[in-house]
Amino acid sequence: MSSNRISETERKRSRPVTKRSVFKKNKWLSPFLVLIIVLIAIVSTILVLNPFEETEKTTTSNSPTTGNPIAVIDTSLGTIRVEIYKDKVPNTANNFINLAKARFYDGLVFHRVIKGFMIQGGGFEADGTQKQSPYGPIDLEINPNVHHVDGAIGMARGSDPNSATSQFFIDDGNQPQLEPGGVDVNGYAAFGVVVEGIDVVRAIASVDTTTKYGMGDWPVNDITIESITIEND
């Protein structure tokens, strides 16, 4: 009796294949196969169109390529790390580094922020009191290979090109008009670039502003420079 047993699978194979059964199978398989082909095509297209997606995400921030010092700017909205181009703009870089090491910037605020332009600080306390650099003004130092790219740090100054002291700004986006021959024939000294924390720059640049102490574009809620420390110097 055991020889007469046929498993369920074998029974299915033993059934006669009719035109109707073939049609039913094909009718079910055709849309299924089409769906598989479409999915394969979609996946292939995604792989072709986005082969460098991860690379693009990781290269949106600048990376230090030399042994230059790194300024760690701790603010009330987060930390910004800036490579200071001591190798390319030494006098301006050393002025900033010396002020940071002397704890000059600790507790000051970003007193002027304009979205899509820049964030500026290093000269005023939260109550509007101006703080003067103990080192006095420095000469304008322009390196033609250092540009006002997104995240560049530069020195603020008055109409006199050699009047920069302690106030600095960080570009929120590319600012070619700050190069020599732009809004000012002499240009503004750029001396480094953000390597981490450009999102913090964006956040600061996006806050609501008002007029305080006779100055416009002052953040409604103070953004404090808690400290600036220098690494690798």
Regions found by a protein language model. Name each.
Residues 2-233:
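Cyclophilin-like peptidyl-prolyl cis-trans isomerases
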